[in-house]
Structure formats: C-alpha cells, structure tokens
A protein has these predicted regions:
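Short, small-residue-biased leader/transition segments that mark boundaries at the very start
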Residues: 2-9
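Structural marker of alpha-solenoid helical repeat scaffolds
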Residues: 36, 80-81, 113-115, 150-154, ...
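Residue-level recognition of tetratricopeptide repeat
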Residues: 40, 49, 56, 84-85, 93, 116-120, 127-129, 154, ...
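Register position in tetratricopeptide repeats
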Residues: 53, 97, 131-133, 172, ...
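Terminal, low-structured helical/coil segments at or just beyond the last alpha-helical repeat
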Residues: 276, 280-307
C-alpha cells in the first residue's frame, strides 16, 4: 500500500523541493509494489490513477513523469496486460480530461458493454458524446436514458442530475411535453423539495407547449417561494396575456414594477395589454417608456401602433 506517499501528495509538501521528493517517493513505492505483484496490469493501473489524480489536481507541475500524458502511457500499458473495464473507465476519464472525446466515448462504451456498466459510465458516455462535433441529441438522450435506468425503477436520487441534463436536451429539440414529464419525475424524486427556479423552468416548458393553466400554477408557486424576484410576476403577466386576461396581466405587471421600477420589458407588456384593450394612447405611453429604458424589441411595436 502507498499510504505514506499518498498522504504526502494529498497534504502537499510545503516547498517545491519537498514536493519533488514526495512525488519521487510515490513512484518508488509503486515500483517496489510492482516487484511483489503478480498482476502487472493492476500495478500500471494504480500508477496511472495516482499520476492522473496528481496531474489533474495540480496543473503547475512540470515533472515529466507526473503529467497527464504519463498517466495515459501507464493506463495503456495496464490495458496491454489485461483489457479490464475498470482500466477502460480510467482511460476514458483521462481522454475526457484531455479533450479527446471520441476516444473517451469509445472507452466508456467498452465499460457499458461489460458487467461493470453503471449509471456513471453511461452518464460519462453521454457527456463525451455531447462534446463530439455534430453529435445527435437523440443519441445523447438515449445514453442518458441508460444512465437513469441504472438508477433503479423508480430511480434513486442519483438520477436527479441526469434527468435535468435530459430536460435540457429535450428543450433544445422542442420536446416540451417530454421535458415537462422529466421535470415531474425530478419533482417526485426530490419529494417536492424544490426551489423557485424549478417552478420557473417548468413553467417555461409548459408555456411553450401551450399549457397555460399549468404554466400559471407553476409561476405562482415560484412567486410564493420568492416574492422579491420581479421576473416571476412579469412572467405571470405573459401567461395572463396568452390567456387573454389583460386586467390580471396588468396587475401582475404592477407587482413586478413595484419591485423593479425600471424593468423595461414590463412597460412593453403593459403596452401590449393596452393595445388589446383598445387603449392606444396608454399603449404608446408604455411603449415609449420601454424604449426609454432600453427595451430591445419595442421599436417594432411603436412603429406598428404609434405612428
């Protein structure tokens, strides 16, 4: 065991010279262990794991034997001795760190084809795939599906970050219903212990799938949890506008402006409400206030309704 050298590396020697001696001692321990081990692959694996851990944690090291490339060489020698999934997992991690995402993906998929496949190995395969130029979002979702499936049925809390990453991909693909389903799964997983941002993000997905009652319920939950954020009553107003409830939208905008008097888009939304109510003068006054405050899209509305 490398107890002494591992503690030395972990605690960091106070001077550069002492750190160098510490690292040399660690390699000496590995070399000593190799003379007594019948599994040469494990020796190279432990060497690669130690070197990679140190090199990734301290990028200022300039010792040739303590670089990520040295870790790559060591893990490849381990695989040359015996091609084990645990070795491939580490090789994948090293390739990922170096930005060699295609190689990392190939390694993780070798792990996934073995009995060592886990939610983590599927997740990192998805992360590697996502970093490959031109990767198909559907393929990445399928990999995340496998990661989540490895978390049990129903899934454990371990699946939570994987579900949120799948939500992001579904939103990019405009799969709003599926995204909402994933948000619901996440909510159930956390037994409802979520914050205001969760309700805001789920509201956005429901809004895009035209579930306005559902969107309204979620944005109102966000307001209850964080009444000081002006974004939420402004978003509530947007929902009311889509529901053609302009009086209530105007009340929501008043609430937002009470918190943030210079919230430009609120004046634009107020103008839209007045247009829908046939109040041209009030609408143009609101649009001009939005323009004064720097709203980037109000010029088109002014040109359309106030010229």
């Amino acid at each position: 065991r490398l107890v002494g050298s591992e503690m030395c590396i972990r605690d960091r020697a106070p001077t550069e010279a002492e750190q160098g001696a510490c690292l040399d001692k660690a390699l000496e321990d590995i070399n000593t262990a190799s003379r007594f081990s019948e599994r040469k692959g494990d020796v190279w694996f432990n060497r690669a794991k130690l070197i990679y851990g140190v090199a990734a944690a301290d990028t200022t090291l300039n010792k040739e034997q303590w670089t990520v490339d040295a870790a790559t060489e060591a893990i490849q020698k381990a695989i040359g001795e015996e091609d084990l999934p645990v070795y491939r997992q580490l090789e994948g991690d090293i390739h990922f760190y170096k930005g060699d995402f295609e190689q990392a993906f190939a390694d993780y998929m070798k792990v996934n084809d073995s009995d060592m496949a886990s939610s983590t190995s599927w997740y990192w395969a998805a992360k590697a795939k996502a970093n490959i130029r031109g990767a198909n979002f559907g393929d990445i979702i399928a990999l995340l599906d496998s990661a989540i499936a490895k978390c049990g049925n129903p899934p454990t809390n371990e699946a939570a970050p994987y579900i949120l990453e799948r939500v992001d991909l579904r939103l990019k693909l405009m799969q709003y219903k599926e995204a909402v389903d994933d948000y619901d799964l996440y909510y159930d997983l956390l037994k409802g212990q979520v914050g205001d941002r969760f309700f805001y993000y789920r509201e956005q997905a429901k809004f895009r799938m035209s579930d306005f009652p559902g969107a309204l319920a979620d944005i109102q939950s966000a307001i209850r949890l964080n009444p000081g954020d002006p974004t939420y009553p402004a978003e509530e107003a947007s929902v009311y506008i889509r529901m053609e409830n302009y009086d209530q939208a105007l009340r929501s905008l008043e609430n937002a402006l009470r918190i943030a008097p210079d919230f430009a888009s609120c004046y634009r939304l107020r103008g839209i409400c007045y247009v829908r109510q046939g109040k041209k003068a009030e609408a143009c006054e609101a649009f001009n206030k939005a323009k004064e405050l720097g709203d980037p899209v109000v010029d088109k509305l002014i040109k359309e309704h106030c010229k």
